[in-house]
């Protein structure tokens, strides 16, 4: 049976695009230190993750300022988020807190619609929509590394 090479090439091209798009969505959901999934009413003390921050990747390259015009500061190990925070439903208010045993830290959070929130050791804000949030925990000073615990509260 004779197969048209141009037709085979056309189908291979479509399959390649599907593979690229699928891989992109998988990579978009990766994190250096894991994921946290939350629904309203979660138990206090259950939304905790650990990691290690610091490096030479400038967090202002993600966003210079957040939705409230606050500066986004700090340095992380790389451009991959440290954590993925998945909100199963909308939250009227959330607070993210970093305990790094005294090392000055920063937070950058990019939401599902591209909305950015920034803070220092803690970040409290309103109107958190359901979806995936990329969370970077940074060191205030370039090259400084520190272990930390990240907690989320309503």
Where are these regions (language model features)?
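Bacterial N-terminal signal peptides that target proteins for export
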Residues: 2-16
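Intrinsically disordered, low-complexity regulatory segments
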Residues: 5, 27-28
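Polybasic/polar functional segments that serve as interface/processing modules
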Residues: 18-21
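N-terminal signal peptide c-region/cleavage motif recognized by signal peptidases
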Residues: 23-25
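Acidic, Ser/Thr/Pro-rich low-complexity intrinsically disordered segments
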Residues: 29-33, 73-144
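C-terminal edge strands of extracellular/lumenal beta-sandwich accessory domains
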Residues: 29-69, 81-85, 130-154
């Amino acid at each position: 049976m004779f197969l048209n090479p141009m037709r085979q090439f056309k189908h291979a091209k479509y399959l390649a695009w599907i593979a690229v798009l699928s891989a992109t969505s998988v990579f978009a959901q990766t994190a250096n230190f894991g994921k946290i999934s939350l629904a309203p009413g979660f138990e206090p003390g259950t939304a905790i993750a650990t990691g290690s921050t610091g490096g030479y990747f400038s967090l202002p390259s993600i966003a210079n300022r957040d939705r409230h015009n606050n500066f986004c500061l700090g340095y992380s190990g790389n451009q991959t988020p440290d954590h993925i925070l998945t909100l199963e439903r909308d939250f009227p208010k959330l607070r993210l807190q970093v305990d790094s045993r005294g090392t000055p830290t920063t937070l950058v959070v990019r939401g599902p619609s591209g909305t950015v929130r920034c803070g220092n050791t803690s970040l409290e804000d309103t109107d958190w929509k359901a979806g995936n949030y990329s969370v970077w925990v940074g060191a205030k000073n370039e090259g400084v590394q520190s272990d930390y615990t990240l907690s989320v509260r309503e």
